[in-house]
Amino acid sequence: MTFPGRFADQFVADQLHTVSLSFLVDNLDVRRGGVGANIAFGMGQLGTRPILVGAAGFDFDEYRAWLDRHGVDTESVRISDTLHTARFVCTTDADHNQIGSFYTGAMSEARLIELKTVADRVGGLDLVSIGADDPEGMLRHTEECRSRGIPFAADFSQQIARMNGEEIRILLDGATYLFSNEYEKGLIETKTGWSDAEILGRVGHRVTTLGARGVRIEQAGGETIEVGCPDEERKADPTGVGDAFRAGFLSGLAWGVPLERAAQVGCMLATLVIETVGTQEYQLRRGHFMERFTKAYGDEAAEEVREHLG
């Protein structure tokens, strides 16, 4: 929602102890989101048929149909009988200040999901990406992956601020991939009390997104890989860019291409998303994707990717 005035003008200095405000907004945009769904949507666009695991509300039917149409397996989404799907509601004023609320809703039921059931249904799991979710659910799914020997990626992002050091240590220890941005990278080290080197010794690969500078992939005793982003045609909305990178990167892993190539696919998809308002509003046209990918990363890289896009 957009408020044409300034929030600051609506507050009375000596009445801040009893605030009661209502804003007449100009427009209402309802957009699909959620980190898991955003990543799955992107992977579906790339043809990898990801399995979305999470908890949604009894209002999920329309969203499920959308994801199904875009190549996402939604059969393992738990549906709450009593709660709505989690959502973020935000109003932005003329100065781009925001007032927002996040409703967790059915997300709290993610802790009730057992990954073994999912694995049995599909004949095994190659990699489980554990993203920002119900904290108890994240811990349960991490422990289940560890106990069952299922490779997993740790990607706590927005939940880092809420979790304590011990919880974060549990979530990342033994991960095949650890995802974060630069700020989160430092916060992880501060909260866990582990140095960068100590964390690298506990995970397979540390994947750090660097904004417009691309991504860095590190591994203990191995070569550091840095990949830049393709040039943007325009910058419309940064929301969901990190999810798009993960979608491209994870798709590359599913294809079996080298890490550098997977990161390039992630950066290309992230660039398409930043050029579009909304996290799932972009269309991946294969010819256009490959044309820009080739321009950014060269013919050899493009040949390795083209065969997987069809």
PLM feature segments, named:
Residues 1-51, 62-65, 300-310:
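Glycine-rich phosphate/adenosyl-contacting loop at the front of the ribokinase-like
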Residues 78-80, 88-127, 132:
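Conserved phosphate-binding/catalytic loop of the ribokinase/pfkB sugar-kinase fold
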Residues 193-310:
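Conserved phosphate-binding/catalytic region of the ribokinase-like
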Residues 136-144, 166-171, 261:
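A short acidic, amphipathic alpha-helical/loop segment
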Residues 68-83:
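A glycine-rich helix N-cap at a beta->alpha junction
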Residues 44, 146, 254:
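Gly/Ala-rich phosphate-binding loop of Rossmann-like dinucleotide-binding domains
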Residues 146-151, 157-226, 234:
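Conserved phosphate/ATP/ADP-binding segment of small-molecule kinases
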